[in-house]
Amino acid sequence: MELELGLAPPNSGHLVVDELSSSSSSGGGSGSAPVSASSAGKRGFREAFQETLLLFDDGSCCNTSDDDCRRRKKTVVGWPPVSSARRACGGANYVKVKKEGDAIGRKVDLALHSSYDELAATLARMFPTNDHQGEKKMANDDHGDAAGPVVTYEDGDGDWMLVGDVPWDDFARSVKRLKILG
């Protein structure tokens, strides 16, 4: 019994492709079922559809010593995909910075900074203040009670601390994100 896939009831008199080719080569007229014009013109599955490419490659086609194969199969780390070579060269230590009241946060590369003063200058360029706030700050500087923005950071333990309380190296190693208040 052969498996027939189709919408017609089983064994409805349709010939299988193998039977059709054997009956036409043997003389054609003495087949067990009549051949209609519509079934003779139908294509087989392999003729109707092309073979698809495999989406998964287990690497069995390449030798492990092949350098071209190694270059093609660079490993991907994280999301979005970043090649391991790019991640290994690294050196970048990006930290998210959010200012209270601003809808958009930014990122700062701490590897480009070597002190708190450089970081403060970068943050001042990234988050400029209005002219009125600058005038108030200058007026307060004369009296000695400058009320500038307070910068806090979240360390590796999840605690929020003031920027400048610890040495720069410890800060750069432990900071996860920055928040500017005021």
Swiss-Prot record:
Keyword list, A-Z: Auxin signaling pathway, Nucleus, Repressor, Transcription, Transcription regulation
Predominant localisation class: nucleus
Recorded family membership: Belongs to the Aux/IAA family.
Tissue-wise expression: Expressed in etiolated shoots and flowers.
Subcellular location: Nucleus
Keyword flag Membrane: no
Location of the PB1 domain: 92-182
InterPro entries linked to this entry: AUX/IAA_dom, AUX_IAA, PB1-like
Induction, as annotated: Highly induced by auxin.
Organism: Oryza sativa subsp. japonica
Protein name in UniProt: Auxin-responsive protein IAA9
Stretches with biased composition (Low complexity): 32-41
Record keyword Transcription present: yes
Subunit (UniProt): Homodimers and heterodimers.
Pfam families: AUX_IAA (PF02309)
Annotated motif EAR-like (transcriptional repression), positions: 3-7
Domain of life: Eukaryota
GO biological process, one term: response to auxin
GO cellular component, one term: nucleus
Biological function: Aux/IAA proteins are short-lived transcriptional factors that function as repressors of early auxin response genes at low auxin concentrations.
Region annotation Disordered: where it falls in the sequence: 1-41
